[in-house]
Design a protein with these regions (language model features):
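Concave beta-strand-loop units of leucine-rich repeat
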Residues: 1-4, 8, 16-28, 32, ...
Length: 381
């Protein structure tokens, strides 16, 4: 017999283990636990036909994780007015009509290891003010506005969201962006405005071709590492950083035609650019590097994704004029650039090198020794 109501459990005060109500499509009302104060294990509500989520007015503590999923008729969550403690993570998944997560406001002062917000299709904004969470994962298909205080100390994972506006939030500890929607009908921008500083940033684009463009229009500094994995097969567009000035370390791998950083002045540590990429029969080569104001790099590395075959190495780049502004570099490592015949663009940077250990050059169309480079023999005759 299908369960249609839970009023017989009104006297329940504590659950030592897990509290799990799942796949009960006949249960249309869920307000029968007014005296429940503690769940020792995991708390799970999933696959219920309820339109309102109420009835946990006394619940203060969940020892394990909290999971609310596939509650397709629920538009708001007001069921936990005194909840103060969750042992591990909170997951809200597949709540297609949920328009407001006032539940997060109740978590102020509570520490969460992880918060997962997946496929909340009706949600357009999210207030993170006061939320203390080590990792926040957001997956969906609609653009969002994230509100909060200036600094968000969390590892933020953004999966498939076509742009997020940061309102009040200027700094985030770590950000990972992946699986942006693909479009082939024309340029579409996926903007992430408001962010000015990030600890580490990882961008991963997908295998399929796309004219969609990820943009960080206000980002000026990445204090840790920038990892760009710009596609794994067919052509995608390079992520745009119009005002990014300082990066600690940067790695680029991908299938873009160009890598552009119009305002970048310094890469404190290593700048590692793999100028070609191979996946099966698909071979992609960078055709342009644009760094007109880059003056300082700790270690400059231009190499290839795979050294197994010459046909997999870049044969398009013929010079390094993109680095004409570069004045200060600790190590120059240029290898497997089969079209490269001129190092003239590194003339200023070479002037500051002091010994041959800072000059690693080989398997290019032209391979000047350290002595030749210091003597100005920077182009193949």
């Amino acid at each position: 017999m299908a369960i249609t109501e839970v009023s017989s459990l009104r006297a329940l005060k504590e659950v030592d283990g897990n509290f799990d109500f799942s796949s009960m499509s006949a249960l249309t009302a869920f307000n029968g636990f007014p005296n429940l104060t503690t769940v020792g294990g995991n708390f799970t509500l999933s696959g219920l036909a309820v339109s309102e989520l109420k009835g946990f007015d006394a619940l203060t503590s969940i020892g394990g994780s909290m999971s609310l999923s596939n509650l397709n008729e629920v538009t708001s969550i007001d069921a936990f007015p005194v909840l103060k403690s969750i042992g591990s993570q909170c997951s809200l998944i597949g709540l297609k009509k949920l328009q407001d997560i006032s539940l997060l406001a109740q978590f102020k002062g509570m520490h969460l290891n992880n918060c997962i917000l997946n496929n909340l299709d009706a949600l357009t904004s999210l207030d993170l003010t006061g939320l203390e969470v080590d990792a926040l994962q957001i997956t969906g298909k609609n653009a969002l506005t994230l509100k909060g205080s200036k600094t968000l100390n969390t590892n933020l994972t953004i999966n498939g969201i076509p742009g997020i506006s940061f309102s009040g939030i200027e700094e985030v500890q770590n950000v990972s962006v992946s699986n942006m929607p693909a479009t082939i009908t024309g340029r579409v921008e996926y903007n992430f405005p408001g962010l000015k500083k990030i600890g580490t940033l990882s961008v991963s684009q997908a295998y399929g071709a796309s004219l969609g463009v990820l943009r960080f229009p206000d980002l000026t500094e990445i204090s840790g590492k920038l990892t760009l994995s710009e596609g794994f097969g067919q052509k995608v567009q390079p992520t745009e950083f119009p005002v990014l000035r300082i990066v600690n370390n940067m790695t680029y791998t991908g299938v873009c035609d160009a890598l552009r950083f119009p305002a970048l002045e310094e890469v404190t540590g290593e700048l590692n650019i793999k100028t070609s990429y191979v996946n099966g029969s698909l071979v992609s080569m960078l055709q342009e590097i644009y760094t007109p104001v880059l003056k300082k790099v700790g270690i400059l590395v231009l190499t290839t994704y795979s050294k197994n075959q010459d046909s997999w190495c870049n044969n398009v780049l013929t010079n390094l004029d993109c680095f004409r502004a570069l004045e200060n570099v600790g190590v120059i490592n240029i290898e497997y650039q089969l079209g490269l015949v001129s190092f003239k663009g590194l003339e200023k940077a070479i002037g500051g090198l002091t010994d041959d250990t800072s000059w690693v050059v080989g398997h290019n169309a032209y391979n000047p020794t350290f002595e030749q480079a210091k003597n100005g023999e920077l182009e193949r005759n």
